[in-house]
Amino acid sequence: MADPWTVEAHRLFKKHGIKTVGYVPDAGLTDLINACDADNDIKAVVMTTEEEGIGLSSGAWLGGEKAAVLMQSSGVGNTVNAIASIVSSCQFPLFMIVTMRGQYGESNPWQIPMGQATAPVLRSLGVRVYEVDTEEDAAGAIENGLKMAF
């Protein structure tokens, strides 16, 4: 059974007209990725690097569609130049769901530096960040993020 937050996220994608979802495979996003992949109204696009999601999202917008990008916090660093040069300069909307690593209790020390830097880096690029501490808070953050982005 899918996590309740991912069921709600998929419902919100449909409600807000998300037609393209780019993702780098991640265990924390598996249920949402699978829901999008099974949905004939959503183009689910597996990416080889997170940076591709910025171009995918921007291209979808230019083509008249809304997109979402899904990734783990360790991949956010790969998106910095694309966000700064494409999204910020062209004022394209950007909606991302980023699962966090490197937080309290992280067992992999390699995840800690980017996990701690993710929100400040995104904010420094002008990206509005909604941080979620519990699954129950995810739907509200996703809904607000979609409204702000589009």
Question: Could you tell me what each predicted segment is?
Answer:
Residues 1-150:
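Thiamine diphosphate
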